[in-house]
UniProtKB/Swiss-Prot annotation:
Top-level lineage group: Bacteria
Cysteine disulfide partners in this protein: none
InterPro entries in UniProt: NqrA, NQRA_2nd, NqrA_C_domain, NQRA_N
Record's catalysed reaction(s): a ubiquinone + n Na(+)(in) + NADH + H(+) = a ubiquinol + n Na(+)(out) + NAD(+)
Enzyme Commission number(s): 7.2.1.1
UniProt keyword list: Ion transport, NAD, Sodium, Sodium transport, Translocase, Transport, Ubiquinone
Name assigned to this protein: Na(+)-translocating NADH-quinone reductase subunit A
GO MF entry, a single one: oxidoreductase activity, acting on NAD(P)H, quinone or similar compound as acceptor
PANTHER family in the cross-refs: NA(+)-TRANSLOCATING NADH-QUINONE REDUCTASE SUBUNIT A (PTHR37839:SF1)
Amino acid sequence: MKITVNRGLDLSLQGSPKESGFYNKIDPEFVSIDLRPFQPLSLKLKVEQGDAVCSGAPIAEYKHFPNTYITSHVSGVVTAIRRGNKRSLLDVIIKKTPGPTSTEYTYDLQTLSRSDLSEIFKENGLFALIKQRPFDIPAIPTQTPRDVFINLADNRPFTPSPEKHLALFSSREEGFYVFVVGVRAIAKLFGLRPHIVFRDRLTLPTQELKTIAHLHTVSGPFPSGSPSIHIHSVAPITNEKEVVFTLSFQDVLTIGHLFLKGRILHEQVTALAGTALKSSLRRYVITTKGASFSSLINLNDISDNDTLISGDPLTGRLCKKEEEPFLGFRDHSISVLHNPTKRELFSFLRIGFNKPTFTKTYLSGFFKKKRTYTNPDTNLHGETRPIIDTDIYDKVMPMRIPVVPLIKAVITKNFDLANELGFLEVCGEDFALPTLIDPSKTEMLTIVKESLIEYAKESGILTPHQD
């Protein structure tokens, strides 16, 4: 199937990494096991400060779903366990042991039963890689998915492409073979043919994949790489009992690497980007998952007025230098943007020849040209205002979902109405563009994300229950 996305926005942000190649690998001294994505679930810590851990060792367990673990991808010593509001777990910091210390496994994918595969996925932290729709939460191991979608079309700003991730291997052929093994493991575990969504320019081993998966291509501007759009186009979710699992290209590489190489894949490709970062420092690097920011960029060169983001500028997590930030669990980029503290002189009279605008507030909005954010920053240009009931949001929402009525239903906790409007098909990140262009400065992304978790808790899916 060919998915064509017409609505959206061409985000050609300045500050992208250089395309000239990779610098040497960066081996950080400290890494983080990020537990923030698992906050919807109750976790039970399996380590304490000062404990020695090896690669593959359990760090935390799903409290209500025993024997499902979040594991360490490195060997070392736990130096800190950081908590947030109400003592919620943020991350576990590990000081790496020098040298190769990977734990070796031996698995024969062909002879393993589905039950054996399930235990391997849960015990080795592979299940923690999977996300679940509806609600966009960590996948629940007791749920049986109707479909599995694998996303190779992610086009968020500054996010490394699948081709970049293949630099982890000695050749493209080896990388794609690891990917095929990962797809085979997923297909066997869930007893179905997963859907793989990619872009035409990516050369996949289609002959091998056609026998085990459904292949779809997608084209169009951001957010055409969103799994929500892929599911909406191929097999929409109509009720909360229709479970769909989603994975990224990197997740499948991690799964395939364990079954093929017998080791946890501990490295990743990371983009260092943003206009507040010196052009000589914008690049792609190969480093350990969960690496510290300080090992990848010199934080002393970052102004206190600049914004550090783990992830992309639209959906990433804001970080502070003094909090010793680390890469997030699913983040493959560090974005550094300017955060202006002074208002422009006569800002209310600015014509805006080269200003980004979607509502034609500036003169640049009347020129038919490729929209480019010449120097993206985090300036809101105003305070929060009453939400405007207009169709501008729908022009950047590719799915047939009315943005303003849905946001109003979610804010008022009218989940029955929200479901009728398509609430079960979306995730918070689908509202990144409506949030970006919103004249009222409403944090739609955060509102939707938190409301999905609240609704998931109300539904009882996050705790064991008898059918």
